[in-house]
């Protein structure tokens, strides 16, 4: 069941946010790769003092109440193991995230 919808304003912002999340979670990513257990890893980061939002999120409850989407300054990235990738993983998905 879909409870929210989210989007980045443009490709540049999506790439920036994704790279920032990966960089901020570098140690967790290295541990995940070393443990060789789960196929995917979800990591997040937030930039509350960032002037520009990284995206917009529409929550189902807000939509039903007649409210529009909200600007957000956080992102969630899902990584997937990929042995053929130089880093050992690829980005499965990335979305702006409402904290």
Indicate residue ranges for each PLM-predicted region.
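Functional cores of ribonucleases/endoribonucleases
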Residues: 1-99
């Amino acid at each position: 069941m879909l409870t929210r919808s989210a989007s980045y304003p443009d490709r540049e912002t999506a790439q920036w946010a994704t790279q920032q999340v990966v960089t901020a979670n570098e140690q967790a990513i290295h541990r995940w790769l070393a443990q060789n257990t789960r196929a995917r890893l979800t990591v997040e980061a937030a930039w509350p003092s960032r002037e520009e939002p990284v995206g917009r999120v529409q929550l189902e409850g807000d939509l039903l109440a007649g409210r529009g989407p909200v600007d957000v300054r956080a992102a969630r990235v899902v990584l997937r193991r990929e042995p053929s990738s130089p880093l050992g993983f690829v980005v499965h998905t990335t979305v702006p995230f409402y904290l």
